[in-house]
Structures are given as structure tokens and as C-alpha cells.
């Protein structure tokens, strides 16, 4: 009788061992799997650049800008003495510099006539220029939208965001002509100022893009700029969402956002 029971135990023990091994393998796969494998696919804007250049011969058309998750999908023009940025009716973005090729830092500006909102500004088709850029101040939006597409000279460049910040106007570094040491200093400050920590490596050997707009986030009497920085991805580099977390300085943002719809006043 005891021998029969002993024989019956072996298959059960074997099955149990197999189940344990399978569970361990599945657990390892779940742990080693990236937190998010969502990727971004470039939508070329080469034809849009060509068409806009043909239609607008009075402007120096630099290229095209497209920002993930927003309706920012506009031409980039060069600001000159002959072009009044404040009087243009088209939706556009602009640059103050006109280098022949991609520099260490590309700086692009856009108007914002809206104040902060109680929710990300991504659902209203009437929003224009850089009015939806401020949506990146919201953590959930920032972690799900990380890519900036910039088309110039027949090339669709892709940048991945590594810094989102609000800075005083006098702290704004506007030049794109930075040497490696200057870029190194800029990157340190940009990463320090950022409200989010992106799991992205960036250094002075990279090329970056900076998007800048005005905001009344801290009130109408304070001259504040909203700024996003992204690093250029190489052609063979996959555009995969990185891990994003809030930093301790994000607490001041959370306090302001408690104002809800009262923040939406434009005056």
C-alpha cells in the first residue's frame, strides 16, 4: 500500500516542479521587459515644406515642426527685419538664427496666447501656435508623449524629450551656436531645472532641440518661459518611450494645478 502511494506522489511532484519553473521564467520575463514599448513613427513633412516654400516666397522657410500628442504641426520660418512675427496670420513657429546645417542646438519659438489649463490642452482644434506645448507640464501627458519631429533640408530629424521646465526670462539662453563646453553647462542646468527625470542619456556630444514659449503659469506679472529640450536620435536608434518620473520641484506645479479651471483665465 505504501509503495503505491509513493508511486503516485512522483508525477504530482514533477508537475509541481514544472509549474514552479514556468512561473519563475514568466516572472523573469516580466521583470526584464521594458516598462513601455510604445514607439514613434516619423511622418515625413518634406512635401509640406516644399509646398509652403512655393506658396510663401516672402519668408525664409527653414523647415517643419511636429510635436507628438499636440496639434503643433507647423512650418518653421526665419525671423528677419522684413518679417513681422507678431503680425503674421498663419500658424507657424520661428527661429532667430539661420544656420546652413543642423547646429549643436536648434532653438524654435512659438506664440502662446492661452494660460495654463486644468487639463492638458489637446482637445480643442482652435488652439494654435504653441498653445498646446504647455500640456507637457502634466506628468501623464509628458510620459506618454516624448518625441519632436523637425524637418529641415530634406531630412526628417527625430528628437526625444529629456527636459521640461519653466524658467525666468533672464535665464533663457537663446543661441544655438554653442561649443561643447557651453552645451555641457547648458545641459546640466536644463536637467537640474526639469520637473521630470527622463531615463535618457544626453551629453555635449549630442545635438539637441529647444522649444520655447511664453506663459503666465506663475502669474501675469512674472516673465516666465516654458521650455522643452530634446536630443537627436540617430537614424538606426529606436524611438521607444523612456521611463519618466517627477522630481521634488514638481510639487510647486501640483500646488498651482489645484486651482483647476480658475487657471484657465486668460487675463
PLM region spans:
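Intrinsically disordered, low-complexity sequence elements enriched in Ser/Thr/Gly/Pro
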Residues: 1-2, 158
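N-terminal Sec-pathway targeting helices
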Residues: 3-20
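N-terminal type II signal-anchor transmembrane helix
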Residues: 16-32
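Solvent-exposed, non-transmembrane regions of membrane-associated and secreted proteins
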Residues: 27-267
Amino acid at each position: 500500500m505504501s509503495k503505491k502511494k509513493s508511486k503516485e506522489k512522483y508525477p504530482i511532484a514533477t508537475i509541481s516542479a514544472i509549474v514552479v519553473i514556468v512561473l519563475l521564467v514568466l516572472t523573469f520575463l516580466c521583470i526584464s521587459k521594458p516598462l513601455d514599448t510604445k514607439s514613434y513613427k516619423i511622418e515625413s513633412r518634406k512635401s509640406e515644406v516644399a509646398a509652403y516654400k512655393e506658396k510663401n516666397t516672402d519668408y525664409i522657410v527653414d523647415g517643419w515642426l511636429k510635436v507628438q500628442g499636440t496639434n503643433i504641426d507647423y512650418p518653421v520660418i526665419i525671423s528677419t527685419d522684413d518679417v513681422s512675427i507678431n503680425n503674421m496670420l498663419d500658424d507657424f513657429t520661428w527661429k532667430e538664427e539661420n544656420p546652413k546645417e543642423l547646429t549643436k542646438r536648434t532653438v524654435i519659438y512659438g506664440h502662446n496666447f492661452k494660460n495654463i489649463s486644468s487639463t492638458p490642452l489637446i482637445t480643442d482644434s482652435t488652439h494654435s501656435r504653441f498653445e498646446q506645448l504647455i500640456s507637457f507640464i502634466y506628468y501623464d501627458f509628458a510620459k506618454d508623449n516624448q518625441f519632436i519631429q523637425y524637418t529641415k533640408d530634406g531630412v526628417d530629424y527625430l528628437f526625444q524629450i529629456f527636459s521640461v521646465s519653466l524658467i525666468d526670462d533672464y535665464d533663457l539662453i537663446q543661441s544655438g551656436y554653442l561649443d561643447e563646453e557651453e552645451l555641457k553647462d547648458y545641459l546640466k542646468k536644463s536637467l537640474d531645472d526639469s520637473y521630470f527625470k527622463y531615463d535618457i542619456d544626453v551629453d555635449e556630444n549630442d545635438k539637441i532641440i529647444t522649444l520655447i514659449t511664453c506663459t503666465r503659469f506663475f502669474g501675469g506679472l512674472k516673465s516666465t518661459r516654458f521650455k522643452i529640450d530634446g536630443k537627436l536620435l540617430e537614424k538606426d536608434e529606436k524611438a521607444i518611450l523612456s521611463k519618466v518620473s517627477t522630481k521634488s520641484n514638481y510639487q510647486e506645479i501640483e500646488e498651482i494645478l489645484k486651482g483647476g479651471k480658475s487657471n484657465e483665465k486668460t487675463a
